[in-house]
Amino acid sequence: MERIKELRNLMSQSRTREILTKTTVDHMAIIKKYTSGRQEKNPSLRMKWMMAMKYPITADKRITEMVPERNEQGQTLWSKMSDAGSDRVMVSPLAVTWWNRNGPVTNTVHYPKVYKTYFDKVERLKHGTFGPVHFRNQVKIRRRVDINPGHADLSAKEAQDVIMEVVFPNEVGARILTSESQLTITKEKKEELQDCKISPLMVAYMLERELVRKTRFLPVAGGTSSIYIEVLHLTQGTCWEQMYTPGGEVRNDDVDQSLIIAARNIVRRAAVSADPLASLLEMCHSTQIGGTRMVDILRQNPTEEQAVDICKAAMGLRISSSFSFGGFTFKRTSGSSIKREEEVLTGNLQTLKIRVHEGYEEFTMVGKRATAILRKATRRLVQLIVSGRDEQSIAEAIIVAMVFSQEDCMIKAVRGDLNFVNRANQRLNPMHQLLRHFQKDAKVLFQNWGIEHIDSVMGMVGVLPDMTPSTEMSMRGIRVSKMGVDEYSSTERVVVSIDRFLRVRDQRGNVLLSPEEVSETQGTERLTITYSSSMMWEINGPESVLVNTYQWIIRNWETVKIQWSHNPTMLYNKMEFEPFQSLVPKAIRGQYSGFVRTLFQQMRDVLGTFDTTQIIKLLPFAAAPPKQSRMQFSSLTVNVRGSGMRILVRGNSPVFNYNKTTKRLTILGKDAGTLIEDPDESTSGVESAVLRGFLILGKEDRRYGPALSINELSNLAKGEKANVLIGQGDVVLVMKRKRDSSILTDSQTATKRIRMAIN
């Protein structure tokens, strides 16, 4: 109070006023502080000060011709004094009002296109529904979130090139538009923005919003996709939340969601194949998500999820240096450790070999529904502070931390044998064995852990073995906190390596990820995922396997036909027939295979019994390891639609139906494509016509390489010899004639010669 009186006193003296208003500020440090850099140091003061001025705005000189000096009320709209330091005019805020009411009206067609992100947002909010407000403590944790709904996923550099090309096409400077998405967007935007009068700089800003993902590290409780983040200020306060359902989806969220589902499916499938890494790469390269190649999305999309990161690692991309265990992302915040193999005994006296981390370390653990801070020493949990949405989530985090601590009392709490296996029926490593065991039932673990008295600390409570909170006692070292633990904020990416079993390691050899860490949660993708790889056929069930197998044979018929004649074993071992085996009843697989292989051999031996439709129909059955038996079959059973259905060896059935007139094949009533039969099946002697210009020398001669199809013969040079596959699946050696004159006689002699060469 005294100070205020003193100030008032001072201000009443005219000398004080004069000093404060007239003296220049000439202390360099102060001038520097307020004038260096383009960043405004005190925005609210600046705003108040500007608005108190008569002419806070500057404008181009042309304004004087377009806006009158005074408005209807006689107020001055701009000053005759020009702005110090530039040749611009100083303008009153009233001029803006005048312009908005009386200024020229331009064509508005481009506004929705340029300001698309805003128009879309208005639509989403218009159709969204806001529910009731609930008052409760909000556990928010900072996460890196996408704050810009509806964007493409271009890198900053790619976007810059697109923007320059669209907005400033005549500017100098090399611009290379390479990716599919860059070219499509550029073409589309150039068409949309023809004759656009909106300032190019504004257009460039708005384009950037549409093309680039912008992320911020924000405190969030609840939905993290961009359509929830855009209304964060409406849905989450410090002590309240408002329910909200967005009024529309945006492609970038759909891509993120579908990418995670595709990656999980692919990693799960690859893990059970003979060569997981090769299979994973094959699937990533042959999969499309919403019409875009998955590998292109992986290169651009920063989503961090276990399966997605495994796919990125396989492609040689950098990923985050944090590691995953039990569905939690661990990031070491301090300390260090060395690893040493150690043998330990479980409560069931089973020996486990574990890699012990020796040394003191601190970690943050971030999961979907719980977060924690973990401090541990060698095989000892020092402290765990955990927070989560509910009791279940908190328990999950505690189990993971207890197992991760490698404490002896945890290992001794194992009851029964540990023999968990992964999808490929291989035993899990010891740490995951322990994790699975306690995730199933943690009662003994919590009971054996030990209890301690606790001091009361603000915002923290103890937790008892039955997961009830307590202010007096708690499981040793474990506390539940009201505050969440922030996600790791850095976007740093590190180089990693991946082995053929999909274990991802950093450069020090620490395992960051493995297929065991991939979530088993099933979801429905929002964008269409097209898996072209045969490994993924089974994802849509038995019918899809059946249709896809036959479609594959038809698409590749030319090469399949040659292999069928010459290298059947290689053909039977093709991975494309693998999924089909799961449809054939196990007990009879081998006999079917033996029967079909014998039948095929007879076709090869006996002239003129080559039957395209029958070969295609029975081929997948020959892929199983054959059992020799005398059994003959008139039909073969496949398990689809929940029961056994029959494929007739000779003739059509609902499963496999070939219409000779239309040449269409239908599988289970679904169109499977057109099947062109071999010409010789209907007309004999065609091969002689095809072989005009060639001399048939005799039986196949292996020295001249694999058999060519008749279509490939045209590439031969005159006098060159080659094996060629003719109608019935037989192979003969031919030579391209040196002279054209004798071509006519070829067709007569060819037929005789073929018969002789074969027999």
UniProtKB/Swiss-Prot annotation:
Protein name per UniProt: Polymerase basic protein 2
Subcellular location: Virion; Host nucleus; Host mitochondrion
Annotated InterPro entries: Flu_PB2_2nd, Flu_PB2_6th, Flu_PB2_C, Flu_PB2_CAP-bd, Flu_PB2_middle, Flu_PB2_N, INV_PB2, PB2_helical
Chain location of the short sequence motif Nuclear localization signal per the record: 736-739
A GO CC term attached to the entry: host cell mitochondrion
Superkingdom to which the source organism belongs: Viruses
Molecular function as annotated in GO: RNA binding; RNA-directed RNA polymerase activity
Site-annotated residues for Mammalian adaptation: 627
Organism of origin: Influenza A virus (strain A/Hong Kong/5/1983 H3N2)
